[in-house]
Amino acid sequence: MSPSTINPESSPLHTYYFSMVEMSIMKLFLDHKIFTLIPTTPGASIPVTTLTTTLNASPSLLTRLTNFLIASGVLSSPQPGHIAHTPKSLQFTDPTSYQALFFAHIFDFFLVPAVKWPGYMAEHGLNEPTSASRTPFGYAAGYPDKTLYEILETMPKRAAQFNATMAASFQPMPVLGMYDFSWIEKLADEERMAIVDVGGGKGQALKEILGAYPGIRPEQCVLFDVDDVIREAVAEAERDDDETWRTVRKIPGSFFSEQPVKGAAVYHIRRVLNDWPDEDCVTILRRIRDAAAPNSRVLISEQILQEEPSLAVAALDLWMLNFGGKRRSEGMFGELAQRTGWKVNGVFRDKESDTGVVELVVA
């Protein structure tokens, strides 16, 4: 039985099928910048034969592809053999636009790995990835034992696309307004480190905290991240001639290895656990627990999964499955804490978003 013999009113099959076809053609048009070749002047069109010459493409193939996009309403055909833009296709005329970047991104980084889910699950069972180096993305890319970032190092073009899309789609996640850091200001006379920003990048969040709480001494704070990132942070501090930021200690290392700063008051970990499977998160939190004092705290700043997430959040959570990451609920953070010698002492939520701070204390 072909798909055309099924009554579309009694089955969602056609909706799924047509979406697959449309997405596949759209990706081709984006890759070959075909949307940019169609005139954007209202009422203007272009002969398909002109496109075939410009693209050195098969006339038969291009006709078949455009036939579907016309039928689906992505393109229009004001006269036989011509195509023109619609409001849908006009969104993709700029290859650097958010729409164009994100479409290609979800195709390459969600759809392609998702197509391989059956094979991945047949090999690993119906289980979440237990390691960032054993993921659906790696399985689909032909690197079943490498992490996303290790794989991207072998794909410069794909890596550039990934980074461009992340930059275009990045929505700032609040650092302040949820948790009251003022108690840390009272530690100014102590010798211990006040804040260790674990996996803190170039220190964007730590800078915000120090700016809002001037009683926290910068010299009592540590930025901890991998070598390359710390080098960039040091260079940035020198370039900006920021004396306050220069006094913050910057220590390179891996959060999977021993935490070099012992007994800090706070180990701040923001937008990190979100990217890793449970077992890797357990390792990260255990390394901190091994370094902690009896009264140390961990502040996990992340987007917190609701018990009944929205469609968009549920989709994002499954997108992260491809790389081994996941969104977590309060209960999930509690389970991680219990496994690593911590306990949840409080959850402080942002009123405008799903962002929150989960405070852990030694169990």
UniProtKB/Swiss-Prot annotation:
One of its GO terms (biological process) is methylation. Pathway: Secondary metabolite biosynthesis. Disruption phenotype: Leads to a small accumulation of pyranonigrin J and the formation of a desmethylated product pyranonigrin K. Induction: Expression is positively regulated by the cluster-specific transcription factor pynR. It comes from the Eukaryota. Keywords: Methyltransferase, S-adenosyl-L-methionine, Transferase. PROSITE patterns: SAM_OMT_II. Its EC number is 2.1.1.-. One of its GO terms (molecular function) is O-methyltransferase activity. InterPro entries: COMT-like, O_MeTrfase_dom, SAM-dependent_MTases_sf, WH-like_DNA-bd_sf, WH_DNA-bd_sf. The keyword Secreted does not apply. S-adenosyl-L-methionine binds at residues 199-200, 225, 254-255, 270-271. Methyltransferase; part of the gene cluster that mediates the biosynthesis of pyranonigrins, a family of antioxidative compounds. The first step of pyranonigrins biosynthesis is performed by the hybrid PKS-NRPS synthetase that condenses 6 malonyl-CoA units to an acetyl starter unit, to form a 1,3,5-trioxotetradecane-6,8-dienyl-ACP. The enoyl reductase (ER) domain of pynA is likely to be functional during the first two rounds of polyketide chain extension, to generate the saturated C-C bonds of the alkyl side chain. PynA subsequently forms the amide bond between the acyl chain and L-serine. PANTHER family: O-METHYLTRANSFERASE ELCB (PTHR43712:SF16), PUTATIVE (AFU_ORTHOLOGUE AFUA_4G14580)-RELATED (PTHR43712). Belongs to the class I-like SAM-binding methyltransferase superfamily. Cation-independent O-methyltransferase family. This is Methyltransferase pynC. It comes from Aspergillus niger (strain ATCC MYA-4892 / CBS 513.88 / FGSC A1513).
